[in-house]
Amino acid sequence: MTAPQVPIAAIATAPGRGGIGVVRVSGPDVGPVMRSVCGQALKPRHATYLPFLDGHGKVIDHGLALYFPAPNSYTGEEVLELQGHGGPVVMQMLLTRCLQAGDGIGLRLAEPGEFTRRAFLNDKLDLAQAEAVADLIEASTEAAARSAARSMEGEFSNAIRQLVDKVIHLRMLVEATLDFPEEEIDFLEQSDARGQLATIRTELSGVLAQARQGALLREGLSVVLAGQPNVGKSSLLNALAGAELAIVTPIAGTTRDRVRETIQIDGIPLHIIDTAGLREHAADEVERIGIERTWDAIRRADIVLHLVDATDYLRHGLSETDDAIDDQLSGQLPPGSPIVRIVNKIDKAPAVGDVVFGGNRPHVVAANGPNPTEIWISARTGAGIELLRRELLRLVGWQSGNEGNFLARERHLTALRNAQSHLDIAAEQAEHQAQALDLFAEELRLAQDCLNSITGEFTSDDLLGTIFTRFCIGK
């Protein structure tokens, strides 16, 4: 693949005021811009302090200029970077000046992500690494940033390439058997093809597990707090966030609209959504709209916490309204979606400690008990909150302390799952070698295509456009 030959320019730093701002120019020949704006040719890969000049030789700003000859640059093309004072007016003046100076060579404003796209097209990085650049910029936690850096350094790509190499080797053995059926030597039997396939499937499962963990770091979890009015949803939001974010009063229906806050638990972003209380008849039109938005949030949630009042629960069991909410939750969410009943306000109920329910009968377990599906808490005192935090992570399969995660995207997970599916089918075909060897080879090819799509070895132009247009301009 070859990048376009038209030179591009953009402000590479974020909008707003700052101590330093950067204008980046990339293309097959940035010499005219360099000589016109900097007044001289620059020594490659050295920072030179000088004035940046307008078209009349007047000073726009003073700063550092750096020139990177091709192919030893970020994009693989010639790159000029001008580092000046980071005011928006100064940066815009400098960018405009570069575009004027480069008019004769067709210099134009870069599109979002175009510098990184050129780096990909010039084989400076693969597609997974290119995506990791954007993920590192957008990382919302330290753990996410570290995982993105590992992917940017090529750890994810290397794991994929190792799998691809093993699939290719196995395909060669299969193709040899198909091409020379008259040979008495059974290539598959001699090379233990089934054993090789089993190894590939095991390693792919490991990469998929790491990618799932990385996807959690990147996307986080959407956790909706649902329940009747005045059961302590806003208090629980405040308890999880460790700050008074939502208004808490004894008046039912205080929360009329969704309140969203992002917190971190073990490096995972949790998007906690406090919602309007659910009840059959809204008090007014505003509350009715709030309840509709609650159900909209529930349908989009990864986990739903259904809060009930501990005192009422102990005295009368689950109310008809809460029972109806349970039924509605089950109907609105995809099968298998986690719904955890949170019994709140245990500080106002008889001393129950850390209690969870099993079946229809309550029983007491330790705070680190096995897989609770109902948790008793006090959002006011904090009792049970740590247990709830651990349960949220357990429900999504988070493995604490895993330093080898890749910051994966949904398309990576889809490609890995599809590759896994093709290898599973190949394993079934391998059991009927004589009758289905050609099908076995085809499933291996399809699995290889899925894996190659992650690094961009086999990728459509439409997908590339979708990925790179989500970058910021200047990157």
UniProtKB/Swiss-Prot annotation:
Domain of life: Bacteria
Keyword tRNA processing: yes
InterPro entries, sorted: G_TrmE, GTP-bd, GTP-bd_TrmE_N, GTPase_MnmE, MnmE_dom2, MnmE_helical, P-loop_NTPase, Small_GTP-bd
Single GO molecular function: GTP binding
Coarse class of the protein's main subcellular location: cytoplasm
Residues annotated for (6S)-5-formyl-5,6,7,8-tetrahydrofolate binding in this entry: 24, 81, 124, 475
Location in the cell: Cytoplasm
Residues that coordinate or bind K(+): 230, 249, 251, 254
Binding site for GTP: 230-235, 249-255, 274-277, 378-380
Family, as annotated: Belongs to the TRAFAC class TrmE-Era-EngA-EngB-Septin-like GTPase superfamily. TrmE GTPase family.
Entry note: cofactor: Binds 1 potassium ion per subunit.
Function: Exhibits a very high intrinsic GTPase hydrolysis rate. Involved in the addition of a carboxymethylaminomethyl (cmnm) group at the wobble position (U34) of certain tRNAs, forming tRNA-cmnm(5)s(2)U34.
One protein family per Pfam: MMR_HSR1
Originating organism: Cupriavidus necator (strain ATCC 17699 / DSM 428 / KCTC 22496 / NCIMB 10442 / H16 / Stanier 337) (Ralstonia eutropha)
Subunit structure: Homodimer. Heterotetramer of two MnmE and two MnmG subunits.
GO biological process: tRNA methylation; tRNA wobble uridine modification
Coiled coil region boundaries: none
Protein name from the UniProt record: tRNA modification GTPase MnmE
SUPFAM superfamilies for this protein: P-loop containing nucleoside triphosphate hydrolases, TrmE connector domain
Enzyme class: hydrolase
